[in-house]
């Protein structure tokens, strides 16, 4: 559903206690036989990330479960990310299975974690613990401590997210203009990504996952 700023002034993205988002469904990608099918899948992810970045109001993620690949990108497309302690992991594994990270997605990553962490996070395919993720900028703030249950930590994070959202909403147009000024126009022919998906090397890597 299209985000309408007139009807909704803020967005809070919350997964469950096990998974924030695992990204694209590899089974759907593997079963796709036509380039149009793959184009639709990757295009949907691109449109979702663009909607988060272009939404004038605050977009805040609460990450209490695994945030992998496209799920990690979704979190990074948020303006602020709350995390919590747990055994879940967060990271980008696209390169390990031969999937391109286009410039528009790299722009989202760089904007969120800074260029000093971009190369490692984008190329080494590491899966970070919540504490490690915070050090790399994948998470802005961890709610609770190691003995805080996820249900309680999620409740606390939701309250903090609502307060932060109100702060940004009350800031008004200066926040909207600042957010828009941080957007980078990046042109990329997604057909390159789609063609690479069908390459023998990528297909072999995906099958081994």
What are these regions (language model features)?
Residues 106-116:
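Hydrophobic, secondary-structure "cap" segments at the distal end of domains
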Residues 31-43:
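A short acidic, glycine-rich active-site loop
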Residues 83-88, 139-191, 207:
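C-terminal long alpha-helix characteristic of the crotonase
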Residues 1-33, 51-61, 84-89:
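A structural preference for short, pocket-lining loop segments at secondary-structure junctions
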Residues 80-82, 120, 124-126, 132, ...:
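Well-ordered beta-strand positions
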Residues 13, 25, 74-76, 133, ...:
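Hydrophobic/aromatic residues within transmembrane alpha-helices
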Residues 48-97, 127:
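Glycine-rich beta-to-alpha active-site loop
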């Amino acid at each position: 559903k299209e985000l309408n700023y007139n009807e909704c002034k803020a967005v809070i993205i919350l997964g469950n206690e096990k998974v924030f988002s695992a990204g694209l469904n590899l089974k759907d990608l593997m079963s796709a036989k036509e380039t149009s099918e793959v184009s639709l899948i990757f295009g949907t992810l691109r449109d979702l990330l663009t909607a988060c970045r272009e939404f004038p109001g605050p977009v805040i993620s609460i990450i209490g479960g695994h945030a992998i690949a496209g799920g990690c990108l979704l979190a990074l497309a948020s303006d602020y990310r709350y995390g919590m302690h747990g055994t879940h992991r967060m990271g980008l594994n696209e390169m390990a299975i031969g999937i391109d990270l286009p410039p528009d997605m790299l722009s989202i990553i760089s904007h969120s974690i800074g260029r000093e962490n971009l190369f490692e996070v984008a190329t080494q395919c590491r899966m970070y613990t919540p504490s490690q993720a915070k050090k790399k900028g994948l998470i802005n703030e961890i709610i609770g401590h190691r003995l805080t249950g996820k249900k309680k930590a999620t409740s606390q994070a939701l309250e903090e997210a609502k307060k932060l959202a109100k702060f940004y909403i009350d800031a008004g147009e200066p926040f909207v203009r600042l957010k828009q000024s941080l957007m980078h126009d990046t042109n990329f022919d997604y057909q390159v990504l789609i063609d690479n998906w069908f390459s023998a090397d990528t297909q072999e890597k995906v099958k081994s996952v």
